[in-house]
């Protein structure tokens, strides 16, 4: 009797461990990718789930929340052969956890490479002036092309933003000179307007004074 007691405790502990490993509680906005003997078996959604602890394992935990990736500045050549430094922010969501897991190796790196290629293609058809003044158009075109290209990977691109567009040093210098000239022009116009208004006030004052003297 007493000899069977430790054996019974061992059986009970083993059973509890098996049950514990069989239970998988998936958090909200998460999906667990389950593999059985190294092969995809199922995707567990949020809530209480059960797996076979002997043959099943959690191969990957996939977030369904919107994710943001900020890629470093990349050199891009415009249609008129100017090299622009552009950094891009991508907002995306995983819509198919299975495709995201097995569709492509290192998906974030793949998105970065695809973003660089798409950006080069779009900017390559635009001049410097068009690039600097068409940010919204570039964002939209980037989103459409990236969304279509990443769909086979179970990814939806919600938004693309060009965080900064930096032209070459000589173009920046020319732009700064142009802006300075424009500021000086506005200042001269304001100064001339102020002098004209002052002269009008002086003339009006002299006119009123002359009228008073005549009376």
What role is predicted for each listed range?
Residues 1-75, 100, 104, 112, ...:
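Interfacial loop/beta elements and low-complexity acidic/Ser/Thr-rich segments
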Residues 62-215:
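Elongated, amphipathic alpha-helices that form coiled-coils and helical stalk/scaffold elements used
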